[in-house]
């Protein structure tokens, strides 16, 4: 390629010189100077919206772009017309691209087996204007289409016969409207400037999500991409597609970032989804330009993709059943690395993704995240980071919203995260019920997703999506990072918490996310304080609030919360060294301070829970006789990963699940669709559960996964990130009453002696979870104090140390193995664990 690069640079110098002396040479004929007249005059449209990936749902036929790239220079009529383009010119172009020396090509070779496609011109153009293009920024995403797409083949075939190279190279403004072949729908685009390449009409970047059987020539541009250039060199552009159904994901083993250096040299523009934000990916030549591909859901065969090809072209340059998809540029949902791909299910880091995808329904959503079919998708994704994605997620039924994240119902909200129900909110993340909250993410339907995802990074709000219905999710995910609220989560049952996730104690959140039931909260998604509390309890089943909780919630207000946050931060800063040493004999002062904070969250219980259960004595006895991994609970994050639990808080990424925080995000995403909805979360849909979901990165993977509910569980799910992964997952659904069941799960988990990560967790859980006693520095102290205070369920001794707080705020100030820092942890450490009671 070095030789060809030199050749290209030499040509560019010559062309530039010609352009300087003959800038007005627009009348030069194609065969004696088309480079000057055509390429040099390529217009750059300012402020052109980026294309948003076409998402197709349902059987698709016809052309992906009005004219299939493989047909641009293939019309048979060209061979017989006097006005045929000069073949020497094409040979020159092919040689510039390093395909073959012109001396080795005949006219036929150039025209049919190796058609000059827009991608080739883009590559050539990028070599000439790469620096300028980087400054201008490229289009971001293309459109989303749902249902059978309008077939323009009749019009296109008519145009193809009349196409001349001059038409394709002429400035955009001089072309007839019928020849532009720009994407039909381009809702809402963001981007500084989009360079209009030689073939502006064929720009649709990838990232199409397809759901259902797809066939037709829409697949042709994939084919040409692989035929263009050496197949082995194109491998770097191919990342998994994420297929659900007959075709499984085939490229999960690829490292999206490993080949970026090679990709940037290849300089093939418009394969990526540009990102939206102050710093957006401008071109594939930039390091930060991941490109994604499509998500396919449903039955999808290669035979379907090749239906529109002639037999003569069916095997063009290695086209085969198992070849093209692997090398299609773009990978789908999740990625890992400093530069995160622009979308997909949930990523958090320096560069967060812009959106997610896939839409389904008879009516196309104008712009939204994705979701599917009569059975609502099993999850929603929310991502947060320094650069938060612009949109949220949506859910769909027979009728998808016309704009906005896709909403479903007779009345679609004007803009919001989508919701389901006869009446959706007019603005806001969608709510369901007779009276929906004014702003929140909850989703509801007969078949609702099994969980919600909320992710938070250094500076970003975390949303949570909760879903509820007859089939309610077993849990929700909320994660919190250095500076971000983690919230929301869903409550289900006849009685929904009246205020704010139902958290009680000094640091109760001002609002909560989504609630479902006869009584929905009036305002959700709202957080108070620079650092919003992070918690996420999800309850499913009949649940009554305690008297103390109700009284506290009636009295609390935003001002109190803000003031209490400041007071608690000051108190935490005053912790004595002696107290720190008590927490851990193995850690230094700074680490002890880190350990000082108690975890913010409690478990999420599903089903009717017996509030009277006393677990102290039973738990102690079990711990002495049982050893094993935790059965469930909330996962926690910190230097020492708790063995189980839901929410995580700390500098280090959460050990599991859909939400990832930090520089490294999970490598894959999810989102699956099918007739049957998954019984577990992170939801994958289909008759068969995915074998590997939610991939995550870390030295150690969790032994099970997020805890899924259903007859069949995925073999590996919700992966986790961090050196120490939770051994199980969290959140379970089913009737769990009485302390005995809970005791068993705890005792199985925390009596593994010699396991450093579990010692502090043992301390925390014996205290904050159910007993409310101070955390012990080690297992021996824990057992001693457990015996002494096992009957003290109210934890009054601990509460007195801080201030008068409702008895329901057990474990409010318990030491925790996890914390963010002296100052940043203070906000989260006091989140009430009592909502689980």
Curated annotation (Swiss-Prot):
Signal peptide: 1-25
Start-end of Acidic residues biased regions: 584-593, 778-791
Annotated positions of the Valine amide modification: 57, 146, 211, 244, 276, 297, 336, 348, 360, 372, 384, 396, 408, 420, 432, 444, 456, 468, 480, 492, 504, 516, 528, 540, 606, 649, 661, 673, 685, 697, 709, 721, 733
Cell location: Secreted
Tissue: High expression in gut and CNS.
PTM sites of type Pyrrolidone carboxylic acid (Glu): 598
Main location: secreted
PTM-bearing positions, type Pyrrolidone carboxylic acid: 641, 653, 677, 701, 713, 725
Function: Reduce interneurons B4/5 activity. May play a regulatory role in nonfeeding behaviors.
Protein name: Enterin neuropeptides
């Amino acid at each position: 390629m070095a030789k060809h690069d030199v050749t290209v640079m030499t040509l560019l110098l010559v062309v530039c010189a010609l352009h300087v002396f003959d800038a007005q040479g627009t009348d030069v004929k194609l065969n004696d100077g088309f480079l000057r007249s055509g390429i040099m005059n390529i217009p750059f449209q300012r402020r052109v919206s980026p294309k948003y990936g076409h998402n197709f749902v349902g059987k698709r036929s016809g052309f992906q772009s009005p004219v299939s790239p493989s047909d641009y220079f293939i019309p048979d009529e060209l061979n017989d017309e006097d006005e045929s383009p000069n073949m020497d010119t094409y040979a020159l172009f092919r040689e510039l691209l390093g395909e073959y020396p012109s001396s080795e090509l005949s006219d036929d070779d150039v025209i049919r087996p190796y058609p000059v496609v827009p991608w080739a011109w883009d590559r050539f153009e990028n070599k000439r204007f790469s620096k300028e293009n980087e400054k201008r920024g490229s289009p971001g995403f293309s459109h989303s289409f749902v249902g059978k797409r309008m077939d323009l083949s009749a019009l296109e075939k008519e145009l193809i016969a009349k196409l001349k190279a001059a038409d394709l190279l002429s400035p955009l403004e001089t072309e007839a409207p019928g020849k532009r072949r720009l994407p039909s729908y381009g809702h809402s685009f963001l981007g500084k400037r989009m360079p209009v390449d030689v073939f502006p009409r064929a720009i649709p970047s990838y990232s199409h999500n397809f759901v259902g059987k797809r066939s037709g020539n829409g697949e042709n541009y994939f084919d040409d991409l692989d035929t263009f250039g050496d197949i082995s060199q194109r491998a770097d552009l191919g990342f998994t597609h994420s297929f659900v159904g007959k075709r499984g994901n085939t490229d999960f083993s690829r490292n999206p970032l490993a080949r970026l250096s090679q990709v940037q040299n290849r300089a093939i523009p418009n394969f990526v989804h540009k990102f939206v934000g102050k710093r957006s990916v401008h071109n594939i030549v930039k390091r930060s330009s991941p490109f994604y591909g499509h998500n396919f859901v449903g039955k999808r065969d290669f035979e379907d993709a090749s239906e529109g090809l002639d037999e003569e072209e069916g095997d063009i340059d290695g086209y085969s059943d198992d070849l093209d998809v692997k090398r299609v540029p773009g990978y789908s949902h999740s990625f890992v690395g400093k530069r995160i791909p622009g979308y997909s299910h949930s990523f958090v880091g320096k560069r967060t993704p812009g959106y997610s995808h896939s839409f389904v329904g008879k009516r196309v959503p104008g712009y939204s995240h994705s979701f599917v079919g009569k059975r609502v998708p099993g999850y929603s994704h929310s991502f947060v980071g320094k650069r938060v994605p612009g949109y949220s997620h949506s859910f769909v039924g027979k009728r998808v919203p016309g704009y906005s994240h896709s909403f479903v119902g007779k009345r679609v909200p004007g803009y919001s995260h989508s919701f389901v129900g006869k009446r959706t909110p007019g603005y806001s993340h969608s709510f369901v019920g007779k009276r929906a909250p004014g702003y929140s993410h909850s989703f509801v339907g007969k078949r609702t997703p099994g969980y919600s995802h909320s992710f938070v990074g250094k500076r970003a709000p975390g949303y949570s999506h909760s879903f509820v219905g007859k089939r309610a999710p077993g849990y929700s995910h909320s994660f919190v990072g250095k500076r971000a609220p983690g919230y929301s989560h869903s409550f289900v049952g006849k009685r929904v918490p009246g205020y704010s996730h139902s958290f009680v104690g000094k640091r109760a959140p001002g609002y909560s996310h989504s609630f479902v039931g006869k009584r929905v909260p009036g305002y959700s998604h709202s957080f108070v304080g620079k650092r919003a509390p992070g918690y996420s309890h999800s309850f499913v089943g009949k649940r009554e609030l305690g008297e103390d909780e109700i009284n506290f919630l009636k009295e609390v207000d935003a001002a109190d919360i803000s003031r209490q946050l400041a007071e608690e931060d000051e108190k935490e800063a005053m912790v004595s060294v002696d107290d720190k040493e008590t927490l851990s004999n193995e850690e230094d002062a700074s680490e002890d301070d880190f350990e000082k904070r108690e975890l913010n969250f409690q478990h999420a219980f599903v089903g009717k829970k017996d509030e009277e259960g006393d677990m102290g004595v039973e738990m102690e006895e079990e711990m002495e006789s049982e050893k094993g991994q935790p059965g469930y609970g909330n996962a926690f994050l910190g230097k020492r990963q708790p063995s189980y639990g839901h929410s995580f808080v700390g500098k280090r990424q959460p050990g599991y699940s859909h939400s990832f925080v930090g520089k490294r995000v999970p490598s894959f995403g999810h989102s699956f669709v099918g007739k049957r909805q998954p019984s577990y979360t992170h939801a994958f849909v289909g008759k068969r559960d995915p074998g590997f979901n939610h991939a995550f990165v870390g030295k150690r993977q969790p032994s099970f996964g997020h805890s899924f509910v259903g007859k069949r569980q995925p073999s590996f799910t919700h992966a986790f990130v961090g050196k120490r992964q939770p051994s199980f997952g969290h959140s379970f659904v089913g009737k769990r009453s009485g302390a005995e069941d809970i005791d068993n799960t705890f005792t199985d988990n925390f009596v593994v002696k010699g396991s450093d990560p579990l010692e502090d967790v043992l301390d925390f859980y014996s205290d904050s979870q159910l007993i409310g006693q101070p955390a012990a520095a080690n297992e021996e102290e824990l057992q001693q104090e457990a015996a002494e205070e096992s009957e003290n369920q109210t934890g009054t001794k601990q509460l007195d140390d801080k201030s008068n707080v409702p008895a329901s705020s057990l474990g409010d100030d318990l030491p925790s193995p996890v914390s963010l820092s002296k100052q940043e942890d203070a906000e989260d450490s006091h989140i009430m664990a009592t909502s689980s009671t």
